[in-house]
């Protein structure tokens, strides 16, 4: 029996490629330090809903991915594009599907402060005549699509289509800690029909299992990781509980209920949720979120943050997400974010009109508590408490 267990663990880790994620200061913190956040918030509406289910023409022509919604992101990984590889810091985002980075064709202030891809310095780059447009709150990032080899955690992903930005509106992006985005959602929401990175990796038989997994460390600058092609059981305790994907676009699942102190605070008759590494907070409909903010004593400060008394953490209850019959508690020490500047709420209101009814986003606040496996082969998400 022990040998069988050992063999199964070996099989799970076979062809497992890891990308280390580094925890950095968020764009919000950078803007606060430079005295720019108030101007930024005045000119940019912070609307997490705008990332999901774009309506009308935007749904087919544009990847609706306002970068204002990455304001609080802290986890970033490094990839290489081209031959020889040019390095970029990206967000590994399960809430979008395109890969894009700044290019030398972009002269916007945001691009000048970041790594820019130079096609002329890559012997494997192939140009196309296709264009890419990604909507921001204040305009669009426009660019072109090309093909090249992308190095991801030791995988050489050849002939990968990606976006090269030509314009990036908004001087605030000058201070962003990332260069671009690597989307890990389904191909159905990819702009311009571009094949997502993980799909291309799987199609080339570069990994042994059609899945990837994510571990986010709560405290350390390092230790967080995205794993392609396998599962490392040392990152979680107990067994993985599997949840069917309810709609193949985002990593969307059905939630049975959301409770605090045993009472339903939202989702009493079930609701939908998207497991999104590219969203830092727990987002939900504005009405129940407002009730939660009131319950935990959160109030808005001049920086638009919902501030909470740090001393309240020990007395506040867990918020419990029941998913596929299993309870997933998130303690106050996780949903209240602490740093040297004090304590802020990890909840954020948004309204998304969808055919699925009430929608929640389980962002990094949730994923720091639960190791997540994104299983494309079986269209399911695996969750287990982090080790």
UniProtKB/Swiss-Prot annotation:
Inhibited by pepstatin. GO terms for cellular component: extracellular exosome. Keywords: Aspartyl protease, Digestion, Disulfide bond, Hydrolase, Phosphoprotein, Protease, Secreted, Signal, Zymogen. Gene3D superfamilies: 6.10.140.60, Acid Proteases. The modification Phosphoserine is found at residue 129. GO terms for molecular function: aspartic-type endopeptidase activity. Residues 1-15 form the signal peptide. The active site is at 93, 276. Its main location: secreted. Its EC number is 3.4.23.1. It catalyses: Preferential cleavage: hydrophobic, preferably aromatic, residues in P1 and P1' positions. Cleaves 1-Phe-|-Val-2, 4-Gln-|-His-5, 13-Glu-|-Ala-14, 14-Ala-|-Leu-15, 15-Leu-|-Tyr-16, 16-Tyr-|-Leu-17, 23-Gly-|-Phe-24, 24-Phe-|-Phe-25 and 25-Phe-|-Tyr-26 bonds in the B chain of insulin. The keyword Transferase does not apply. Disulfide bonds join 106-111, 267-271, 310-343. Belongs to the peptidase A1 family. Shows particularly broad specificity; although bonds involving phenylalanine and leucine are preferred, many others are also cleaved to some extent. This is Pepsin A. It comes from Callithrix jacchus. The lineage of its organism: Eukaryota, Metazoa, Chordata, Craniata, Vertebrata. The gene is PGA.
């Amino acid at each position: 029996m022990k040998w069988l267990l050992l063999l199964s663990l070996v099989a799970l880790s076979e062809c497992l490629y890891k990308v280390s994620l580094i925890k950095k200061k968020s764009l919000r913190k950078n803007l606060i330090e430079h005295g720019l956040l108030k101007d930024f918030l005045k000119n940019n509406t912070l609307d997490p809903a705008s990332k999901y289910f774009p309506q009308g023409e935007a749904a087919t022509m544009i990847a609706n991915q306002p970068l204002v919604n990455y304001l609080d992101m802290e986890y970033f990984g490094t990839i290489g594009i081209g031959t020889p590889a040019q390095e970029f810091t990206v967000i590994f985002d399960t809430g979008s599907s395109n890969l894009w980075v700044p290019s030398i064709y972009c002269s916007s202030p945001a691009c000048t402060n970041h790594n820019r891809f130079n096609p002329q310095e890559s012997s494997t780059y192939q140009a196309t005549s296709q264009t890419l447009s990604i909507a921001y709150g204040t305009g669009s990032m426009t660019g072109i699509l090309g093909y090249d080899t992308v190095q991801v955690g030791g995988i050489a992903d050849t002939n990968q289509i990606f976006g090269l930005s030509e314009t990036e509106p908004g001087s605030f992006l000058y201070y962003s800690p990332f260069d671009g985005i690597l989307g890990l959602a389904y191909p159905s929401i990819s702009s311009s029909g571009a094949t997502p990175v993980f799909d291309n990796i799987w199609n080339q038989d570069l990994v042994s299992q059609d899945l990837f997994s994510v571990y986010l460390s709560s405290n350390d600058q390092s230790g967080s990781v995205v794993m392609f092609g396998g599962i490392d059981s040392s990152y979680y305790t107990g067994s993985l509980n599997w949840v069917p994907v309810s709609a193949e676009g985002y990593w969307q699942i059905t939630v049975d209920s959301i409770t605090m102190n045993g009472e339903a605070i939202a989702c009493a008759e079930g609701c939908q949720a998207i497991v999104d590494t590219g969203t830092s907070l727990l987002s939900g409909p504005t009405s129940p979120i407002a009730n939660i903010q009131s319950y935990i004593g959160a109030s808005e400060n001049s920086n638009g943050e919902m501030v909470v008394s740090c001393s309240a953490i020990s007395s506040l209850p867990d918020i419990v997400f029941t998913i596929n019959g299993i309870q997933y508690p998130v303690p106050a020490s996780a949903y209240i974010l602490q740093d040297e500047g004090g304590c802020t709420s990890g909840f954020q209101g948004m309204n998304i009109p969808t055919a699925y009814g009430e929608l929640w986003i389980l962002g990094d606040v949730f994923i720091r508590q639960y190791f997540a496996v994104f299983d494309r082969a079986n269209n399911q998400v695996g969750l287990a408490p982090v080790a």
